[in-house]
Every structure is written in structure tokens, then in C-alpha cells.
Amino acid sequence: MKLSRRGLLAGCASMMLATCRRREPPPAPAAAPRTVDLFIESDGDFLAFTPDTLMCPTGAIVRLTFHHGGKFLSARHNWVLVRPGQMEAVDKSVEHEEGLVSKDDPRVIAFTPMCDKGASVMIQFAAPGPGDYPFFCSTPGHGECMNGILRVINDL
């Protein structure tokens, strides 16, 4: 088979055009979740958290440090974050002699272990969707006074 000069040029031109066509840039990598550091402590030897309201953006990785600010009383404290409307039910369901929260409870978003006075602990969790999420101390009798709100907003 004999190729004409015109056919050869047409074939070369089409190959060049095929390699020169516009290519879409690769998709941008997904942004890593934002990390937010929050600090909360028990208010000395009182049954209260300071602050009693925390704020973070939805989807953020939250690194929460809880400090037991007590100096004299030996009561242990923790921090338990639950779904809206679930604080009382979760508080009633904990093992009340120790105030321990079940890690398998779907109503619980995050919690710290119990801390003795002067101790600190850091936990990490993904912020839930927008809304107000209650938190409390699950030591028996503390939840009524020792509670607050994590306000999750679309963006800070």
C-alpha cells in the first residue's frame, strides 16, 4: 500500500492535535479538616465548668483539654459531650458508683476519663453538625450543676 504525501501529512497532523489537546488539571486535593484546640476546667472546688460555653466549626478536629481545677476536695470530674436532648438520659445510664460512661453509647459523642484534682487530660474528636450540644460531668450528682454547651457553627 502506497501512502500519499497528503495522507501522511494528515495522519501526522491528527496525531499532533491529539497530543496537544487541552488537558484538565488534576482535581485539587481535599482540604484537611481544621484543628481547633479548646480548654475547659472544673472551677476550683465548685461544681461548675469554666467556661460553660465552648464554640467550634462543624467538621473540625477538636482537641479538648480538660483540667480538674480542684485543690482541696477529692471529688473526681470528667467531661461528657452528648447529642442534644440526651444529657439527662445519659447521666441516668452511667455506672453511678464511678460515673463511668459507656464508649458504645450512641448518644455520647466524646468524653474524658475521670480526673483527680490537679490532673489534665486531652481528647480528640470530630465536631458534629451545627447545633448546641450539651456537656456535663458524670460523677454522681454533679451533672445538674456541672454542665454547659458546645456550640457548633458552620464557620468561625
Predicted regions and their residues:
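Beta-strand signatures of extracellular beta-sandwich domains
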Residues: 78-82
